[in-house]
């Protein structure tokens, strides 16, 4: 029976790296075949997942020999960290492998929004239309960007935004005031309300917790200057989508880009369909060929290290160290 089971897509170089050290089963469709997965869990010691495999008590109970879980990404919504810690199972995310990747996506979204949808004009132009007056664009230079959360990805966004002449403000109560990272921001905000009121563009970079769920609700959106833009590449539940749709339809909000939604995938005919000035993408801000390779190699190496009794190069998320 395999020592390592990989249930979702992983770059082949990462698969080869772990398979050279442990008997490995790689089947990216296992996440959708629970009975087949259950049969492999009985003897597996290492499990590698993306964001769909639910690593919770029912799965852990079927994997009595499990020692470590490798997460091909950084979000941990699908992994019960407390249950893993109680079972003595380490959780090793792909920390740092897509920070720059996501920040590039955020900047692309920012430029698309501030250009008033000009990058979505292909079909009209190809059909013979010439809608030059339809697009109400703004220069990026001189705008004020507010970052909610100031971790690794947000800091990369700050670096790139400042290169465009954008003023950067940030809010993060978990980053100490003396942290040198604040040098990347022009302004450190004491609360979300202050940040919203002084931002032309807001980009969200916080995990989904009970504290952050619907952090951006109707009241928060009302604090933004008229015509402001909102970008979310973090977690869908941080924004109250119905409040967002109302703000876009009323024209109070100039535009929004969502790479993450409260329900993924979005149901056909959902409240997000046909909303003006709303750009959607299928949770791909951190996915490029390069980022997937980096994550796959890092996770493969760290899972192998953990199973060999070595020291992984990333912190164990289940124990916070």
Q: Residue locations for each model-derived region?
A:
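Phosphate-binding beta-alpha-beta segment of Rossmann-like dinucleotide-binding domains, i.e.
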Residues: 87, 95-144, 159, 178
């Amino acid at each position: 029976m395999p020592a390592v089971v990989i249930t979702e897509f992983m770059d082949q170089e990462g698969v080869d790296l772990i398979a050279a050290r442990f008997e490995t089963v790689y089947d990216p469709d296992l996440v959708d075949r629970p009975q087949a997965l259950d049969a492999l869990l009985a003897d597996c010691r290492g499990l590698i997942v993306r964001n769909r495999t639910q690593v919770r008590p029912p799965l852990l109970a079927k994997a009595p020999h499990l020692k470590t879980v490798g997460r091909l990404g950084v979000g941990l919504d699908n992994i019960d960290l407390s249950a893993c810690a109680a079972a003595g199972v380490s959780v090793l995310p792909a920390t740092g492998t897509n920070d720059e990747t996501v920040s590039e996506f955020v900047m692309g979204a920012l430029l698309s929004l501030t250009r008033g949808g000009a990058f979505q004009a292909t079909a009209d132009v190809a059909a013979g239309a010439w809608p030059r007056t339809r697009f109400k664009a703004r220069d990026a230079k001189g705008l004020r960007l507010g970052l909610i959360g100031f971790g690794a990805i947000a800091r990369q966004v700050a670096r790139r935004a400042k290169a465009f002449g954008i003023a950067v403000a940030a809010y993060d109560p978990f980053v100490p005031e003396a942290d040198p990272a604040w040098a990347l921001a022009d302004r450190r905000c004491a609360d979300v309300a202050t940040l919203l009121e002084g931002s032309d563009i807001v980009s969200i970079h916080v995990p989904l917790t009970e504290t952050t769920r619907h952090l951006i609700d109707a009241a928060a959106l009302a604090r933004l200057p008229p015509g402001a833009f909102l970008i979310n590449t973090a977690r869908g539940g941080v924004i109250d989508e119905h409040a967002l749709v109302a703000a876009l339809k009323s024209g109070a909000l100039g535009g929004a880009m969502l790479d993450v939604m409260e329900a993924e995938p979005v149901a056909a005919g959902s409240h997000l369909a046909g909303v003006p000035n709303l750009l959607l993408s299928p949770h791909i801000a951190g996915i490029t060929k390069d980022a997937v390779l980096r994550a796959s190699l890092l996770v493969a190496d760290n899972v192998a290290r953990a199973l060999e009794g070595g020291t992984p190069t990333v912190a164990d998320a289940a124990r916070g160290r």
